[in-house]
């Protein structure tokens, strides 16, 4: 997790945006049949739905942290967030690639607006919220989301390469 207290909110959002752009380009390049095909139990469509959900979960979690509460999504950590991810896959159920990518873009805009509203001094602060020995902050939560986009981009790219 990121512990660079000198990074600005805008620099971290730029990192997130780069990873999102890479992910979106990867998904856009998929034929519809691959977009809906299962890979490792999920389809690329499911991954997009999962990431749409995480924009909302991140906002909710940051609000909880700022109140000194543990983010509620962490209650699903031990099962690798399977329950909340399943909710997102069902909630964002379209099979239309462009529709889901538009929802992803909209969810990210809401997330970025929210993050820009957080005072800088709260970005890396920890109001006593720890989980499994880690300090949880807005900053490292966003770094985790950024890493999730990179992970899923690699996952889809490796899956596509394995089909050749």
Regions found by a protein language model. Give the residues of each.
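Extreme N-terminal tail/first-helix region
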Residues: 1-21
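Short, contiguous alpha-helical
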Residues: 1-2, 34-83, 123-164
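Short amphipathic alpha-helical segments with heptad-repeat character
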Residues: 10-17, 48, 52, 98-101, ...
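Long, hydrophobic N-terminal alpha-helical segment
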Residues: 15-44
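Structural signal for well-ordered, non-membrane alpha-helices
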Residues: 17-28, 55-63, 105-119, 150-153, ...
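Acidic/histidine-rich alpha-helical segments that form the ligand environment
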Residues: 83-124
């Amino acid at each position: 997790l990121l512990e660079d207290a000198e990074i600005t909110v805008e620099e971290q959002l730029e990192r997130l945006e780069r990873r999102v752009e890479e992910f979106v380009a990867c998904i856009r390049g998929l034929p519809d049949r691959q977009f809906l095909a299962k890979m490792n139990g999920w389809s690329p469509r499911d991954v997009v739905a999962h990431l749409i959900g995480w924009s909302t979960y991140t906002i909710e979690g940051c609000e909880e942290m700022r109140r000194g509460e543990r983010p509620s999504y962490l209650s699903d950590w031990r099962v690798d967030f399977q329950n909340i991810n399943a909710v997102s896959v069902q909630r964002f159920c379209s099979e239309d690639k462009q529709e889901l990518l538009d929802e992803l873009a909209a969810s990210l805009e809401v997330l970025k607006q929210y993050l820009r509203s957080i005072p800088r001094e709260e970005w890396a602060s920890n109001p006593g919220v720890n989980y499994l020995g880690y300090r949880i902050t807005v900053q490292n939560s966003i770094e985790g989301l950024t890493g999730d986009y990179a992970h899923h981009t690699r996952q889809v790219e490796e899956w596509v390469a394995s089909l050749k």
